[in-house]
Amino acid sequence: MDEMIPKPLISNDNEMMHGHGYTTMVHGNNEILNGNELAVHAEVIPSASTRGQKRKSAIWEHFTLVDVSDGCKRASCIHCNQSLAYSSGSKNSGTSHLTRHIAEWCRVLKDRQKSRRYTTYNSSNENASFDQERSCLRLAKMIILNDYPLHIVQQPAFLSFVDSVQPNFKMVDIGTIETEVYAIYLKEKDHLQQALANIPGRISLTVGSLTTNQSIRYISLAAQFIDSEWRLHRRVLKVMMAPWPQSENAVSRAIIKCLSDWNMQDKLFTITLEHDCSSHDIYSANLRNHLSGDNILMLKGQTFAVRCYANILNAVAHGVLASVHNVIYLIRESIKFIKADDAHENKFAEIAVELKITSNNSLCLDVTSEWNTTYLMLLAALDYRQVFTLLESYYDNYGTAPSTEDWKKVEAACGFLKLLYAFTLNIMSAEGNHQTANMFFHDAWVLQLELQNGMAHGDDVIRGIVIGIHEKFDKYWKDCNVVLAIAVAMDPRFKMKMVEFAYSKIYGPTDAAKYVKLVDDAILDLYKEYAAQPELLPLSPIYVDQVPADGLPFIETGGAPATASPSTAAAGAGLVDFDMYLSEVTTMGQPFKHELELYLEEALTQRTPDFDVLKWWQDNTLKYPTLSRMARDVLAIPMSTVGVGSSVFLPDNGSRSLDDYRSSLRPELVEALLCAKDWLQYSP
């Protein structure tokens, strides 16, 4: 259904209009009307075929003369039947007032002209280019992209609307629209497979879940990668019903089959799982064992499994709320009491004014499944804590005001929720290239430190809140801090300096060294694996790389590079021991260092608000050809299973849910709709 754009109804100045036996000259901005329409305020020049005829003005196409008495005639509008004076005896009123009537007053004619303009345009343009198949395809895309139900094609109001826009479109049935959806899904899948086959680096996978109202669980797999232009992408690969009976082995096999279908086994870098330790520990181990057996995982799978950062933040937040659930109940009931009656609300506001309480927060009830709304409810309630207490003295039937001790618990809980809320917003606010893996380390180490300090806090209230949540996040930190650290080390603004600083805060100056060494060793081992792989990019002539026995390319940091003759090059094949020796000593004060050493030793890049880490690596690819390949894959690790632009404030179980309509569809149709919606967003 193409958008209709009416043709202009005003011709250019001095354009000659021919028709109906007369010629109309349009002057200035005078309006012309096509067909039987009148050229208003235009000079009418009789044509040869009309000379000598009575009433040469085209106005008489819109009026008829009616004799009303002897010598008196009136002009009757043929459109609205209004009667206008024309002549009385020998006196003639002329036609100017008749022209004004047609141009300005006759509503019937105006409505008819509007309809004719649309019909004329529609018949001369739209019908000529109308394509039933194309319109059906666009209808299917509209349904996919807007989450409309397939049975919209049967809804009377929609049918009426389509008929008014394009009467020639023959509405299709549900079966036909399903076929269109599948065709779009298969076409877009083929495009994505071709794109993934040509990306320069590895691909990381996310595994999420969707629940339904029928207690059926779907598994969603998405790929994240950085393309040749150093742009970060995430694409859904598959949405499948969880195997039944559900088991960790069955889920592992389903994921492996998906990797095989997409030819991704050899390109897989990491896999990010939702934070459900009870099952994911098992099937992540299954996946690691299977893929490590084929020798396709980097670092032998040590950094293969990553836990979802958004999930752990949600789990910790719900843990904080659980520690004060009794107080939350009292606050909810108090707000309900206040909002239930205008008199209660007015009295509440009156007390707040008397107490000179000024707050930008307004009382509101929360959505119990979204912890951020509960946090905002508690935050507002804290501002008015004195009002809640005084309100009891005015109403005998109000008895749910929190106590002083209760407010102390809420204040402590909000201290932790403030951090969690800010960190979660950081994930949601990251757009496009900015949700790279390096951005997660900062918030994670701060939260780990805060929870550690909370465990040792002298206040029983704070310690009571932290006890329930520290174990959850500590498990995440132990599993993922090395991956997080490697990622932030690939940020030239921080490198290993940020890791050293954070670890000294968390572990203390003495113990920090051994944890820093773990990260140092992991980065070096990972770099060696990339260095041992074939170089994919041409080297800059300034940086001359040589690959010794340990697989590390070395860069000569001083002096001019020598030009080797063929005989010298051949002899070089037997100098492996010498190359290894050079890697350990310096010659003539000119050390040989590999790219990783040079990168880490260089001064930190200045921190600016608009810094783009991917742009930095793109600009420095020739300087660090091997390290940039490693950085491309590391920065593409999805630390969260939640995509950009999606809400990360999840229910306590950490799962998203399908709506009732999609829950009722066949699994293959659910997959086609969800995958195609994701892919169509990026189609030209």
UniProtKB/Swiss-Prot annotation:
It comes from the Eukaryota. Zn(2+) binds at C77, C80, H101, C106. PROSITE patterns: ZF_BED. Keywords: DNA-binding, Metal-binding, Nucleus, Transcription, Transcription regulation, Zinc, Zinc-finger. A zinc finger (BED-type) spans 54-113. It is found in: Nucleus. GO terms for cellular component: nucleus. This is Zinc finger BED domain-containing protein RICESLEEPER 4. It comes from Oryza sativa subsp. japonica (Rice).
